[in-house]
Amino acid sequence: MAKKVTAVIKLALQAGKANPAPPVGPALGQHGVNIMMFCKEYNARTQDKAGFVIPVEISVYEDRSFTFITKTPPASVLITKAAKIEKGSGESAKGNVGSINRAQLEEIAKTKLPDLNCTSVESAMRIIEGTARNMGVSISD
């Protein structure tokens, strides 16, 4: 018989830098999960993606064991890295803080495709383009 899931926890953590301090400790501690075991596994699985924020979905079971799935970095993080900017514009309609080209947009779309609710790279590119526009990043050809 399959183990019963008691909780699903979603966190966004720096790749390779998870530690028992907040937000990891309190989120996992209240469900009785071994925090250090999670931190070691997460850091080992994400060490090659250093510098990115990696979302993780942790399933906690009745016997206090857990499994987790790492997702792709948020589109906004990938866009800021590609545009070489610190952060997006506070007022996207007024300010243009940077730009990325179509090749960079396609690369980001291919990276995000497994986590997006679409099947083609073209539709993923439109989703990422909308995110970039809302951040004040323009798309150049």
Swiss-Prot record:
Part of the ribosomal stalk of the 50S ribosomal subunit. Interacts with L10 and the large rRNA to form the base of the stalk. L10 forms an elongated spine to which L12 dimers bind in a sequential fashion forming a multimeric L10(L12)X complex. SMART domains: RL11 (SM00649). GO terms for biological process: translation. Forms part of the ribosomal stalk which helps the ribosome interact with GTP-bound translation factors. Pfam families: Ribosomal_L11, Ribosomal_L11_N. The keyword RNA-binding applies. One or more lysine residues are methylated. Belongs to the universal ribosomal protein uL11 family. It comes from Parasynechococcus marenigrum (strain WH8102). CDD domains: Ribosomal_L11 (cd00349). Keywords: Methylation, Ribonucleoprotein, Ribosomal protein, RNA-binding, rRNA-binding. The gene is rplK. GO terms for cellular component: cytosolic large ribosomal subunit. PANTHER family: 60S RIBOSOMAL PROTEIN L12, LARGE RIBOSOMAL SUBUNIT PROTEIN UL11M. GO terms for molecular function: large ribosomal subunit rRNA binding; structural constituent of ribosome. It comes from the Bacteria. This is Large ribosomal subunit protein uL11. The lineage of its organism: Bacteria, Bacillati, Cyanobacteriota, Cyanophyceae, Synechococcales.
